[in-house]
Amino acid sequence: MGLIVFLTIGIVFLLIGLTANNANDSIKKKKAIASFYDLKATSIEGEEISFDQFKGKKVLIVNTASSCGYTYQYEGLQKLHTLYGKDVVVLGFPANDFLFQERGSDADIADFCEKNYGVTFQMFSKITTKGRNQSPVYSWLTNKDLNGWNEKKPTWNFCKYLVDENGDLIAFFDKTVKPLSKEITSLF
């Protein structure tokens, strides 16, 4: 009887330890292999934006959609931009990858974001976050051979990636993690 209790307790502690290790799988600190600062993307206004202008700042990259249950997160992203904008850049990438929740044109998206959420952070032209036509930005974010460690692709709209001030990807956050959560802001 004592041996069974001892083994059961040992197994429970082993499982707790394994779970604790898995909780940190979304936050890493490894040097990127390909430079984040070599990336470029087209702004929602149609201008090419070079990521080298973000050197020295943390960058939060979010795949967005206007007709999603998580669209309310635009408000939190804007607040984050307002509160931390001196040190943190928010980049929004509209995508129509999940149940066609971003059907509008770039002009429609820009208008929606401004009217409904007062968005002033940098928004980009609509992209694809996965598959054959994946944007170069999301190729870098989701390919460990480029970013150094991460292969997690967006599972839905409003997944977030955090790049540090040296251009290294340091964290991935699922759609349920709100922009102003401690999980994110503790890394600023």
Feature map (PLM): residue ranges:
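Conserved helix-turn-beta segment immediately C-terminal to the redox Cys motif
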Residues: 57-58, 67, 71-96, 114-117
